[in-house]
Amino acid sequence: MALEADVKKAIIDEYATHPGDTGSPEVQIALLTKRITGLTEHLKEHKHDHHTRRGLLLLVGQRRRLLGYLSNVDIERYRALIARLGIRR
């Protein structure tokens, strides 16, 4: 499920480290978290939608890799981000 343009822009503006930032790990992880939340809500209602479940697992894996990268590069940015997003990890 793709994010609407205005929602995506709001997330990018909130988590950007500098103006025009769309590729930093913080922004990517925040966007993935929003998509994961949406797919999780979808799967609560449509339990047998296995194609969506696979897509969700791929997104979770991608977010996990980005979180691992961020924790290796800058642990303080990592801790601040998971606190802001409310990701228990």
UniProtKB/Swiss-Prot annotation:
Pfam families: Ribosomal_S15. GO terms for cellular component: cytosolic small ribosomal subunit. GO terms for molecular function: rRNA binding; structural constituent of ribosome. PROSITE patterns: RIBOSOMAL_S15. GO terms for biological process: translation. Keywords: Ribonucleoprotein, Ribosomal protein, RNA-binding, rRNA-binding. InterPro entries: Ribosomal_uS15, Ribosomal_uS15_bac-type, uS15_NS1_RNA-bd_sf. It comes from the Bacteria. Coiled coil: none annotated. Belongs to the universal ribosomal protein uS15 family. Part of the 30S ribosomal subunit. Forms a bridge to the 50S subunit in the 70S ribosome, contacting the 23S rRNA. One of the primary rRNA binding proteins, it binds directly to 16S rRNA where it helps nucleate assembly of the platform of the 30S subunit by binding and bridging several RNA helices of the 16S rRNA. Forms an intersubunit bridge (bridge B4) with the 23S rRNA of the 50S subunit in the ribosome. This is Small ribosomal subunit protein uS15.
